[in-house]
């Protein structure tokens, strides 16, 4: 059975885990109502996308 030859150091373990982080979604202000929304999506509060009303 495969067994590690040496114990993994704190530094190596932490360097490996640097990529396991959460990312904050790209929030922007809506041009119409100035509420925060996700980029490239319809505004949930007013229903505008690129200056055009697309949702009720």
UniProtKB/Swiss-Prot annotation:
Keyword tags: Ribonucleoprotein, Ribosomal protein
Pfam family, one: Ribosomal_L32p
The keyword Ribonucleoprotein appears for this protein: yes
Top-level taxon in the UniProt lineage: Bacteria
Gene Ontology molecular function terms on file: structural constituent of ribosome
Family annotation (SUPFAM superfamilies): Zn-binding ribosomal proteins
GO BP terms: translation
Gene Ontology cellular component terms for the protein in this record: large ribosomal subunit
Keyword Acetylation among UniProt keywords: no
Family statement: Belongs to the bacterial ribosomal protein bL32 family.
Protein name: Large ribosomal subunit protein bL32
Species, as recorded: Brevibacillus brevis (strain 47 / JCM 6285 / NBRC 100599)
Gene name linked to the record: rpmF
């Amino acid at each position: 059975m495969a067994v590690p030859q040496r114990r993994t150091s704190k530094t190596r373990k932490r360097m490996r885990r640097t990529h396991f982080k959460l990312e904050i979604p790209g929030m922007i202000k809506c041009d119409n109502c100035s509420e925060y929304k996700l980029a490239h999506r319809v505004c949930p509060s007013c229903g505008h996308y690129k200056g055009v009303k697309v949702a009720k």
